[in-house]
Amino acid sequence: MRILIEPNAHHHLNAGDAAMLQVAFRRLRELFPEAVIQVITEAPERLDRLCPGAEPVPAAGRRIWFNDRYFGDRLHRRLPGRARAALGRAEDGLRRRWPAAARAVLETKGALKRTPPREVREFLDAVGDCDALVVGGAGAVTDPFAPLALTVLELVETAADRGVPVALFGQGIGPIEDRELWHGAAAALPRASLIALREGRAGPGILRTMGVRDDRVEVTGDDAL
């Protein structure tokens, strides 16, 4: 069994974020002692101190996958605002609907530059081979962290598309006024097998409005406490 953890914070410098990652890793190790547990990280050595035995997955690959422009930054810079935004949406659509094609484009770009994107391959292999996706504790599904949240939600959908169970631990949901974030969350979160919340006052109602079933939501508190 292979479990992939998306910790949201990839440098592991924030004490609270690091504690939530440690708790998630420890619980998974106790439940599945034979599993291979991978963690997306910018700091493999720090990860090894926090979670001995965890396999690092390069966050650089994650960053390239979600941020790299298939038609090149130079073209984006030359386009006027609306055209640039439209091209960006088209590239995002390619990644979401046809990830194999998007991967091929990135690998071709890397080969032409003679810098094959090893990190992208390792990241996508981890996503494609995992038997479960776990999103670590965070208060990221909210307007101030919308760019990060949208990438996490896309990961949730990618796993769900493969029939892989998804669990989100220690989540703070909302407030959300950003329309793109709301639609992204409403598309992804109902597909999760479990969403554990930090609090029970606002989060359950927000999730219910998004179409998340009550039997998939638990109020567990903050994993760092």
Predicted features along the sequence, with ranges:
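A nucleotide-sugar donor-handling region in carbohydrate enzymes
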Residues: A111-V120, G172, D178-L225
